C-alpha cells in the first residue's frame, strides 16, 4: 500500500496550477475534464505518479470558493533552506504566513505558506531534501 494523492477543491483551476507549478516548482502531470458531471482535474507533483504522492486539484464548475473548516491541517514539503524558499515564494507572488524559524518546543526549522484558496503548506527544512522547491 502507498499514498497516491491528496485532493484539494479549488475555486480557480488555472490560478492553482500556476501557484503549484510556478511558485512551488511542481510539474503539471495531467489534466482531465468531465463535462457530464461538470468538474475538471489537474494533478501536480515533483515526480511521476507511479513513484510519488501528488496533489489532485479539483475544480467543480461554477464554485469559486470553499469553506475550509477547522479539521484540515496542512500539506508538508521538504526544502533545503526554509528562509530561502520563503523568499523565492514571495518573489513569485506567494503568501508566506509564518517566517522560517524553529518549531515551537523544538529545533526543526519550519515555515508556512498559503495557496490561493487558503490551504496551508508547511515547509520543513531538511538538508539534501532532493528535488523540488528550494533545490
UniProtKB/Swiss-Prot annotation:
| Single GO MF descriptor | protein homodimerization activity
Pathway membership, UniProt:
Secondary metabolite metabolism; methylglyoxal degradation; (R)-lactate from methylglyoxal: step 1/2
The note describing how and how many cofactors are bound reads: Binds 1 nickel ion per subunit. In the homodimer, two nickel ions are bound between subunits. Is not active with zinc ions.
Record: active site:
122 (proton donor/acceptor)
Which InterPro entries does the record associate with it? Glyas_Bleomycin-R_OHBP_Dase (IPR029068), Glyas_Fos-R_dOase_dom (IPR004360), Glyoxalase_1 (IPR004361), Glyoxalase_1_CS (IPR018146), VOC (IPR037523)
Q: Which domain of life is it from?
A: Bacteria
Catalytic activity, reaction form: (R)-S-lactoylglutathione = methylglyoxal + glutathione
Q: What happens when the gene is disrupted?
A: Deletion of the gene increases the HOCl sensitivity. Mutant is more sensitive to methylglyoxal treatment.
- Specify the VOC domain's residue ranges: 2-126
What keywords is this UniProt entry annotated with?
Detoxification, Lyase, Metal-binding, Nickel
Please name the Pfam families in this protein's record: Glyoxalase
A single GO cellular-component term from the record reads: cytosol
| Subunit record text | Homodimer.
Family listed:
Belongs to the glyoxalase I family.
Q: What name does UniProt use for this protein?
A: Lactoylglutathione lyase
Species annotation = Escherichia coli (strain K12)
Give the organism's phylogenetic lineage: Bacteria, Pseudomonadati, Pseudomonadota, Gammaproteobacteria, Enterobacterales
